[in-house]
Amino acid sequence: MENLQLVLFVLGAIAIIAVLVHGFWSIRKQQPKSLKESPMSGFYKDQASVRDSQGFDADGIGEVRVRKEVPATDRQEKEDKPVQEPAFTAAPSRDVEDSRHEQAFALSDEPVQRAARQRQEPVLSMGANAKDDEVQMELGLGQDSQSSLFETVEQESVVEPTPEPEVKAEEPLGEPKDVLVLHVVANEGEELNGAELLPCLLSLNFKFGDMDIFHRHEDNAGTGKVLFSLANMVKPGVFNLDNMEQFTTEGVVLFMTLPCHGDPLMNFSIMLNSAHQLADDVGGRLLDGGREDWSESTKQLYLQRIRAQLD
């Protein structure tokens, strides 16, 4: 038993050592070779030895130059040598004369150039003046056309004010020459109730006003001239608005004076229609001025009376 354990121990140690050796060998194998051992090392050595005509290798690096230090004695001797200044000769005098001659020549040329300019200026000015004249003529024509255009536009834009119609002052009607009368009365044995009568009058555009009676005006809102009026048929013929709920009457009377404001035929038509509507609303009857039943013949008589006033 002890021998078996010893054998197993030895085999395990050998196996471990083999694994370690194999690991180190594989790691060594995977590492890159050094630059010396690489195949490109020879190429780089050859390229380093080859240089161009200026002394630079393939990488653009030149040879290393060692500069020797100059001894102090030689440097001091160079500094002690006097600097020779350039000697000036009399040759520049010719240059001065040449420059003077050039200046004189330039001065002598200026009057000629100025004269030439003066001779050329009138020609240019004449051409410019001619062009200016043409431009001015064109501008003048343009201004004339523009001014005429503006004048026509102004004439068209100016609108003559239309004369306002003269408002003729209304002539006074004077004394009444005729009165057209209509009656709206309750049926026999009945009376008109004020609480029912007032809403009907307001719906017909009557307005309570002067003399404590109702009036029908030109405007439905109750403004303008009075066309006709409505009064109580019972004396004194007035109404009391504060007591309309307790008010009762046998009937009301509608009347229109001639002459009147506006068209009398139109005014009478409005009054007749209002009387018919009021009689229907309160359940009464329509009578003429003589308190007779209204008829078509009576209507024609009223129209004849109106036309007589118009003639």
Swiss-Prot record:
Signal peptide: none annotated. It is found in: Cell inner membrane. Keywords: Cell cycle, Cell division, Cell inner membrane, Cell membrane, Membrane, Transmembrane, Transmembrane helix. GO terms for cellular component: cell division site; plasma membrane. Residues 62-83, 94-103 have a biased composition (Basic and acidic residues). Residues 46-114 are annotated as: Disordered. Residues 28-311 are cytoplasmic. It is a single-pass type I membrane protein. GO terms for biological process: division septum assembly; FtsZ-dependent cytokinesis. SMART domains: ZipA_C. Residues 1-6 are periplasmic. The keyword Membrane applies. Gene3D superfamilies: ZipA, C-terminal FtsZ-binding domain (3.30.1400.10). The chain crosses the membrane at residues 7-27. InterPro entries: Cell_div_ZipA, ZipA_FtsZ-bd_C, ZipA_FtsZ-bd_C_sf. Belongs to the ZipA family. Essential cell division protein that stabilizes the FtsZ protofilaments by cross-linking them and that serves as a cytoplasmic membrane anchor for the Z ring. Also required for the recruitment to the septal ring of downstream cell division proteins. Interacts with FtsZ via their C-terminal domains. This is Cell division protein ZipA. It comes from Shewanella woodyi (strain ATCC 51908 / MS32).
